[in-house]
Amino acid sequence: MKRCFLPFYHASFAVLLGAFPDLAADPGGVLNLWRDPTSPHARTADGRPHLGPSQIDHRLFGEGGGPEDGAAWATIPEQLSDADPWERAYLQLRLAAERDIKVLIGVNPALIAGLPHQLAAQWPRIVEEIARGTVGGVPHTTPDPRRAEQIARRADEYGVLDPYHLWPNLRAAVAWNSALASLYLPRVRERYGPGVRLFAAPIGSSEGPVAVPVDDHPNAAPLYLPGCYFEFADAAEPIREDSPTVTAAELEPGRDYHLVLSHIGGLYRCAVNDVVHVVDHVGRTPRIAYTGRDVLRTAGGVDLTERAVVRALAGTLADTGAELRNATVETGTDRFRAAIASALPGPLPAGFATLLDKHLGETADGYRAARDAGALAPVEVLQVHQDAFQREWEHAIRSGQRRTRVKDRIFQPAPDSWARITADERAHA
């Protein structure tokens, strides 16, 4: 923690604090959705506690937690500490709703995209509890009927309560802004207010730290070389135990690599199941962007990767002017099927599916050849309800997953997820 993770974590706020130095003196204005050190701990099969990085109380190591340190209001009442993940999400939002939040730390972009959905569902309960001075039904704060009435009035005036209406002085949000998130965060950011800046979160995983932003690059950061020893394998081939690797000094801009790391925490040559793209160099240090998980789906003899889907979607959006709230892909018997939630009202533009098929032929190895040979049918596009992915996000949290772990999935891990997302299918495009 002291030599590998904590220096990485604290360094990740440098660009944010450089832009807004006053935040260091105003921890009460920072809402960190990612950290939840009082949440219940999971246990391994043999009974040992298992914690994700977001659950660790940094004070155990003599360190602060981040820009939000010292915000006494942010602590969930002890008698509610065993609340389920969805209720914990409500409790944190209820506490923050009374405050003048200026910065939102999400890290996981699904948290940034999900918060407006959560707020739309929970604001009446928030208003009621602020007026009474309760949190989760427990007396906790001074009753504030004036603030409660202000929130209710804004919801009535706008017909919806977005984060901007709740926190009009919001200035910045921090989240991963690459891969699938790069396609939907620009539209999501509008719900947080005009002029709100989006800062790239550090790139990392539960296995270890990877890259820390040092400037305003929107979605890439230089490798965090003090934290791990990194190796990279060509992502054009599946990674195996005997895959040849190169060092950070040998990385080539414009190429994709499997990420392998070792560090003093005990991991040795761990393939973390992530693929990164080398953007350029900062000095001699490679700057990388996360492109997706190393997961495949196969149809018609074609292995489809997450990064191929994201790049094909990006090209299709650019060609059609469409905007999306999220997307996912599944394998049919002889084709791939894409579920698209549009960010704009009405049906997807005419020809969307044809253009997506064209771009998949450009980004996915073997796709065009399989189409030409008749082994693969054209991609099928299903336009789903605008809120389909936010509903699935809520379902996952209500089912017991910690919200920091509920992430975007180009390929859903279970068939029932696809079934729920496409339950209110509105159109074929």
Please give the residue ranges for each predicted region.
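Amphipathic alpha-helical scaffolding segments
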Residues: C4-P7, V30, A121
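Hydrophobic alpha-helical transmembrane segments of membrane proteins
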Residues: S12-V15
